Regions:
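Conserved G1/Walker A P-loop phosphate-binding module
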Residues: 1-83, 194, 200-201
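Canonical P-loop GTPase G-domain recognition
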Residues: 3-15, 146-201
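Short, glycine/charged-enriched secondary-structure capping and boundary segments
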Residues: 22-23, 43, 86-89, 124-128, ...
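Conserved nucleotide-binding/hydrolysis micro-motifs of P-loop NTPases
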Residues: 58, 71, 78-81, 116-118, ...
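Residue-level signal for inorganic ion chemistry
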Residues: 65, 142, 185
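Conserved nucleotide-sensing/catalytic segment adjacent to the nucleotide-binding pocket
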Residues: 68-106
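Amphipathic alpha-helical transducer elements in NTP-driven molecular machines
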Residues: 89-93, 120, 182
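Conserved C-terminal guanine-recognition region of P-loop GTPase G domains, centered on the G4
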Residues: 94-169
């Protein structure tokens, strides 16, 4: 995938109606502070279009990034922020559930998991939630640069086991620092686009 132009096109809050996009969508889900914004910026070759923050719970909206006028990167609210009150947590959860259930253009969901730790209960719930909505999530194991290379396969196995994910669930280690894993993600996105527009192959 060659990134030519990107823009933040639509921001949806709790009461907003989801846009009726004509281009396909790929969504990015993950707990607060897992590195969603860093991944999206890395994929778009931008430093700060998707705002990163050391403060968890920063993304409280569904943000649609138009990429090359052919695909949307959809940044879903981070979940599992402990300091958010229960009402806010419920609202975020409903936003994510509504999006997964109602989006007509959603083709693929990336679920981000911190490679340093076993998936949390919220991660397991989200993984099952995505699958129940008819999607086979691709796991992006973020913060790859925070562990030694010798630990990578052990941590990937831990993620797979904790999520009870089958061998068909793809797990891609990703580093926001070195961009390791980005080309694999680009190949997946190219495949999604090719499947949607076979005449362009």
């Amino acid at each position: 995938m060659i990134i030519k132009n990107v823009s933040l096109e639509t921001v949806c809050g709790i009461t907003s109606k989801l846009p009726e996009n004509i281009h396909l969508e790929v969504a990015f889900a993950g707990k607060s502070n897992v590195g969603k914004s860093s991944l999206i910026n890395g994929l778009m070759n931008r430093k700060s279009l998707a705002r990163t923050s050391a403060q968890p719970g920063k993304t409280q909206t569904i943000n649609y990034y138009n990429v090359n006028d052919e695909i949307y990167f959809v940044d879903l609210p981070g979940y599992g922020y402990a300091q958010a009150n229960e009402n806010v947590k419920a609202q975020w959860g409903k936003m994510i559930e509504d999006y997964l259930h109602k989006s007509k253009q959603l083709k693929l969901v990336f679920l981000l998991i911190d490679i340093r730790h076993a998936p949390s209960e919220n991660d397991r719930i989200m993984y099952d939630w995505i699958r129940r909505n008819g999607y086979d999530p691709i796991i992006i194991a973020t913060k790859l640069d925070k562990i030694n290379r010798s630990q990578i396969q052990k941590q990937i196995k831990l993620i797979r086991t904790t999520l009870q994910a089958g061998a068909d669930t793809q797990i891609i280690p990703y580093s926001a620092q070195t961009k390791q894993g980005r080309e694999e993600i680009y190949e997946i996105l190219d495949g999604v686009l090719a499947a949607e527009n076979p005449a362009q192959e």
